[in-house]
Each structure stands twice: as structure tokens, then as C-alpha cells.
């Protein structure tokens, strides 16, 4: 990465790769470290690693979304004071938007995904109630996911709660009903069956939402490594056909290309977490390391050969 910028989220847009490049002097709430003038970027690369374009973005960017064939959305400031940057990748122009009211969860926005034409965003850094013996990370009663719509004033966006942090869900391994306690909504994904997947990072769980909306159903997969709860960042499912993986290592300022000698098995889930790339058994939540020795892996995508 150029200079001291650190890669985070990755996006395949057309035939190029867009990369969040964070200036570490941008705090996650959008403020700057005292005495610094940080400038984070979104960098566009071709598949040979050449820089094609650079977009300077305000605050601490974290999420990327392909809205359509010529538009990329960027979420910035995952702890507080969230903004959206809408980039026209054909005209190479961009616009910054702010929420039309303070988000209910009092935090920022992290990852985004589009499903059936609706944009969903993770409600990161929520204000939670006091910790208890059974809820050491606090107790959530605020939204964990919003839908995002742009307002006609071209300056603001609107957030509508789509999933509460204390929603009722089915625990996948035990097939029992539980009450969620999502204290750290972070990365998002779409699984092969079309479910919206939300990573509640410090809670070490993936939450699956079937048919998001009024008639949605929710299930939760606690994640473990060698029997211990294990937090992850991005999770992706290997596609059919030939592909390779790109994985960003934030503090190492690296993006790895990972190829499987015999090819990736379609439908297998992979997660980046705690210096390791892991496969995920989506029936039990048990994970298996497949690539180790990284610093802080964050963004993960598959790219078709």
C-alpha cells in the first residue's frame, strides 16, 4: 500500500479491485489524531496490482458496496459520525452524504451489502447496557442492521432498523430458540442461499437473516476454534468455477493472493480472523486454520479467473 495506508475492505467492481486504504491517524469516529492531517483513500487497482485511480475520502473508511455498474458506496467512521461517500466510477466524481438524524444505536456504520435491491448496513459500535455475568460485552437493545436509502436532497441518507440486536433467533448447532445480544455488528456477506449474514465480531458469531423484511427469520452460528470462541472479520463462500482469493492484512499493509492447488471447493465458507484464514463448518461453527502467520487480516473476496 502507498505510504502508511492500511488496506481493509475489498471490492471487485467491473474488472478492477477497489481497496479501502485507511490512514491510521484517522480515528474510527472520524476525528484526527492530535497534530496530524490524515487522508484515507479508496484505491482502484487492476488485477496486476497497478493503481488505476485514487479517491480521497473523509474520515475512517470501512465498508465498500457496488451499487451498480458505475457506482461504489463507501461507509466511513464506524464508531460515530457516520458518512456515505458515493463514487461515480465512470465520471470519477464523488459526493459525501450524512444521516438525516442521529442513528438510533448512537454509533457508526461498518460494512454494507445489497440484497434484492435493498442496501443493508451494519450498525457498528452500538451503545449497550451494562455487562452482566451472562453478557460480558454488555446488553444490546438497539438496531444491529439498518436499511439505507439516499434522500432526494442529495446531501443526506436515511436509516431504517432492519434487525434488532436482541432479536429472537434459532441457534444453528442446537436448533433452539435464543435471544441475540449483538454488541459488535461488523462485516457482512451474502451466503450461497441468499441469506444476509452479519458478523457480530466480539461476540464470535455469524447471524443469518432469511428474507430480510417484515417476514424475516433469523439464525445464529457461534464460532469456535479448538473449542474456544473465536472472533472473525470478513466471511466469504467460495464460488463455483476457477477463482482465487484476495485477503487484506491491515497492519502489515499487504494484500495477499491465495490460490488453492486443487481449486477452492464451491460453497465452502472462509473467514479472516486473528492472524489466520479459516474454513467454517456452517452447521457446527467449528473453524479450521488453513493459512496462518498474518497480522490482522480484514477484507476477503474471491475473484474468478
Model-based region annotation:
Residues 22-25, 76-79, 123-127, 140, ...:
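Short loop/turn segments immediately following the C-termini of beta-strands
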Residues 34, 40-43, 83-85, 144-146, ...:
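A short loop-to-beta-strand structural motif that recurs across blades of beta-propeller domains
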Residues 20-38, 122-142, 208, 257, ...:
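Short, conserved, GDST-rich strand-edge loop motifs in beta-rich repeat architectures
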Residues 87-93, 147-159, 209-216, 259-263, ...:
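Short loop/turn segments immediately following beta-strands, especially the blade-tip
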Residues 1, 143, 157, 243, ...:
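Glycine-centered loop/turn motifs
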Residues 2-14, 39, 55-71, 102-119, ...:
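Beta-rich, blade/repeat-based domains predominating
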Residues 60-63, 75-113:
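Asp-box/WD-like beta-propeller blade repeats and closely related beta-sheet repeat scaffolds
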Residues 1, 50-56, 93-103, 158-179, ...:
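A short beta-strand motif characteristic of beta-propeller blades
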